[in-house]
Amino acid sequence: METTRPTWHRRLTIDIPAEADLYEKLKTYQWNATTQIDWSRPVRNFSDEAYEEVKAVYSREDYDRIRARERAFTFTQLFFGEQAALALCAQLLNECPEIETKFCLAGQIMDEARHVEVFGKYLDKLDVDAPLNPALEELVHRLLDSDHYGEKIVGMQIFLEGVAVGLFQQFQHTSPDPLMRDMIGLVLRDESRHAGFGVIYLSDKFGSVSTAERRRIEDFVTDLWRLFHHATASPFGPVNEFLKATFDDIAHRLKLIGLELRA
C-alpha cells in the first residue's frame, strides 16, 4: 500500500458497491452553509444555569468574555483541523486506485471545504484570536507528510473522522448556543458519512495486507493518539470522559478493519 501515481480508468467499473451507494447519499444530502444556517443570530456563550454557578465571582460581561476565549480556542483548532482534512482528502484522491473511492473523496473534499467555511464564519462572530495547539499542529503535519498511503488513509478516515464525530456529538448535547448546534448538526451529518466510508473502504482493502504492514499502520495511529491525547489538555469539556469515549470509538472502528489501537 505504498504511495502511487494516479490510476486511470478506461471504463466506469465499480469494485466496492457499498461505496457507490454512499456516493449516492452524498449527492442527496449536500447542504448550503449560506442559506441553511441563520448567521444573523448572536453567539450564546453560556447558559443561564452555568452563569448561576459563577455569578458571585463574575459579571455577565466578564463571564461572556471568558467563555468566548475558551470557545475561540476550541474553534481555532477545529478550523485548522478542517483545513487539514481538506488537504488530506486532496492527497488521497490522487493516490486511491478505485474510481468509486475517488467519487467519495471528491464529495468529501466539498464537505471539508464547507466545514472550513462554517467554522471560519463562527470564529468571525466570536471575534477573538486564539493560538494553535502545537501538539495538534504536529499531529496534522505527521499525517500530511506521511508518504505511506495506508498510514494516511487510516489516519484520515478512521482516526481524524472518529475524533470529529465524537467531538461534534458532545457539542450537540452540551452547547448552549442554538447557532452552534445548528451548524454542528449539519457538519456531523457529513462527518458520520465520512467515518462510515472509511470503515467500508478499509475493511475491503485491508483483507490482504501483510502483518508488517498492519503493524506499521497500528504504530502510526498509536502515535497520532498520543499526540491527540497531549493536545486535548483542556478545551473539549470533561477531558477524561471525552478521551475514553473517543479512544473506545476509534479502537472499535480500527477493529472493524482488522487493526488495533494501543494506549
What do these predicted regions represent?
Residues 90-95, 168-172:
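Well-ordered alpha-helical scaffold segments within catalytic/enzyme domains
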Residues 125-136, 140, 150-170:
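All-alpha helical catalytic cores of prenyl diphosphate-utilizing isoprenoid enzymes
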Residues 142-144:
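Helical catalytic core of nucleic-acid polymerases
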Residues 169-181:
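Acidic interhelical loop/turn segments
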Residues 103-107, 182-185, 215:
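Short, charged, amphipathic alpha-helical segments
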Residues 172-175, 188-195, 199-213, 228:
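Alpha-helix capping/termination and helix-coil
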Residues 1-88, 94-102, 125-132, 147, ...:
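Terminal targeting/low-complexity segments that flank the catalytic cores of oxidoreductases
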